[in-house]
Amino acid sequence: MNQIVVGMGDALWDCLPEGKKIGGAPANFAYHVSQFGFDSRVVSAVGADADGDEILEVFAQKGLRTQIERVPYPTGTVQVTLDAMGVPCYEIKEGVAWDNIPFTDELKRLALNTRAVCFGSLAQRNEVSRITINRFLDTMPDCEEQLKIFDINLRQGFYTKEILCDSMRRCNVLKINDEELVTISRIFGYPGIDLQDKCWILLAKYRSCIVPGDP
């Protein structure tokens, strides 16, 4: 059994008032998994620009293996500003590289040899990456040992009921926090019950293991 673990989706720069730092939940997942000795990969896309060069350089310095395509779009960034109360505000740039991850023959081979993959909703806001993520999930061997982890990670308005349904149908592990559970319940039409009952409904409908997300 192959033991490759993949973090798939957005790889970007968080541009903070004090400077920029690398971001993207899938990349963070792959990095932390690698610290336990697993063979992990980051699957994403960056632009043919300085920001893309830096992302690849940072991953290389961390010893993190990647399958990141260069595409004719700018490398993703999130502009972070503080309002008058010091609360951070986020502007997630659209039309960027990780919105356009291609499904390649190399990616198909990786899917066939992947034990676990973590993906989210944000990277599916554009059709190109959404199709690639779904093809990757559908190409993975269909057996109980494979983990398809949907870190729902709702961001602004970058999700639809269709995206959420498709992802929950394909995953067998759902990572979700209380706030996201309330949002999902409203979208799917069962808001007036407690959180535990909401979890049981999701479990019965999608037959996924549900794990708590960050607050």
Regions found by a protein language model. Give the residues of each.
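Ribokinase/PfkB-type carbohydrate-kinase core domain
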Residues: 2-6, 58-60, 66-68, 84-215
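Substrate-binding N-lobe of the ribokinase-like
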Residues: 4-5, 14-87, 94-101, 105
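Active-site beta-alpha turn of Rossmann-fold NAD(P)-dependent dehydrogenases/reductases
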Residues: 9
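Nucleotide phosphate-binding site architecture
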Residues: 13-14, 182
